């Protein structure tokens, strides 16, 4: 965290491309739901948000060390080195996608024993990552940029049997890659879980920033701004 000469505080935030939540505005002219919310909250409190796309595993490591001011966006589970606000950005659902000709359907963790599953390095999938790894027949974790797009193409090419990711994000990239006619959703894992901005515990201002998010979200929901941003991205999620 640093300041301009005008004393505006600069927040350095990182995350991976995860549209419609975090989008590349140079490609689609929109920043994404979470980036819009984050900027609205902090810009109104004399902060300047500097956001950069990074592979998620790298973002986590940099966040844990306090090399950046925040990570966007994260589940709380398994993230003990971060401080989180109390009100979630959104409730998230993790879903499986397979090729349309595939008969497999997720029923419980035991059903994973039949598939080769594509995941993204560093993701915890709503806190279910240990049970997933303990039950799946085989797992391929992909790192680097555009991980979900790479996994969906691996599924298309039958290199893996299924892909697991956030429901709205899967919908976005399946449409983007024109894969709607060849893929289908086949079950959700666990319950809906909140997504949050994570602030490193090693940084002294993290609790203050988390409190700022809670106050900002409360204000945005009361004024209708939050709902307006949801609608902008075609989301009508209950929160």
Which ranges hold each PLM region?
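Short Pro/Gly-enriched coil loops immediately N-terminal to beta-strands
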Residues: 15, 84-97, 111-113, 186-194
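Extended ligand-binding regions for polar small-molecule ligands
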Residues: 35-44, 110-116, 123, 199-232
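Extracytoplasmic small-molecule ligand-binding "clamshell" domains
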Residues: 6-82, 144, 223, 232, ...
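Short loop->beta-strand "edge-of-pocket" segments that line small-molecule binding or catalytic clefts
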Residues: 9-23, 109-125, 218
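Ligand-binding cleft/hinge of the Venus flytrap
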Residues: 38-47, 87-89, 111-113, 122-145, ...
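A bilobed periplasmic-binding-protein/Venus flytrap-type ligand-binding module shared by bacterial periplasmic
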Residues: 95-105, 193-208
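A ligand-binding cleft/hinge motif common to bilobed small-molecule-binding domains
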Residues: 61-64, 74-82, 161-191
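Flexible hinge/capping segments at coil-to-helix
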Residues: 99-117, 132
């Amino acid at each position: 965290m640093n300041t301009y000469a005008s004393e505006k505080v600069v927040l350095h935030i990182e995350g991976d491309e995860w549209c419609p939540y975090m989008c590349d505005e140079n490609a689609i002219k929109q920043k994404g739901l979470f980036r819009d919310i984050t900027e609205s909250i902090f810009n109104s409190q004399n902060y300047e948000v500097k956001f950069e796309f990074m592979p998620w595993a790298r973002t986590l490591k940099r966040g844990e060390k306090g090399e950046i001011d925040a990570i966007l966006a994260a589940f709380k589970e398994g993230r003990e080195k971060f401080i989180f606000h109390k009100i979630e950005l959104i409730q998230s659902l993790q879903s499986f996608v397979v090729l349309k000709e595939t008969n497999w359907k997720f029923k419980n963790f035991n059903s994973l024993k039949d598939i080769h599953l594509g995941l993204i390095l560093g993701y915890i999938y709503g806190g279910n990552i240990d049970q997933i790894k303990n039950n799946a027949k085989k797992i391929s974790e992909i790192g680097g940029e555009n991980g979900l797009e790479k996994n969906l193409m691996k599924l298309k090419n039958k290199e893996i049997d299924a892909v697991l990711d956030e429901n709205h994000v899967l919908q976005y990239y399946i449409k983007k890659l024109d894969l709607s006619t060849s893929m289908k959703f086949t079950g959700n894992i666990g319950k809906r879980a909140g997504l949050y901005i994570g602030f490193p515990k090693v940084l002294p201002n993290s609790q203050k920033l988390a409190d700022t998010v809670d106050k900002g979200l409360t204000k945005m929901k009361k004024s209708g701004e939050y709902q307006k941003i949801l609608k902008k991205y075609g989301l009508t999620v209950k929160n």
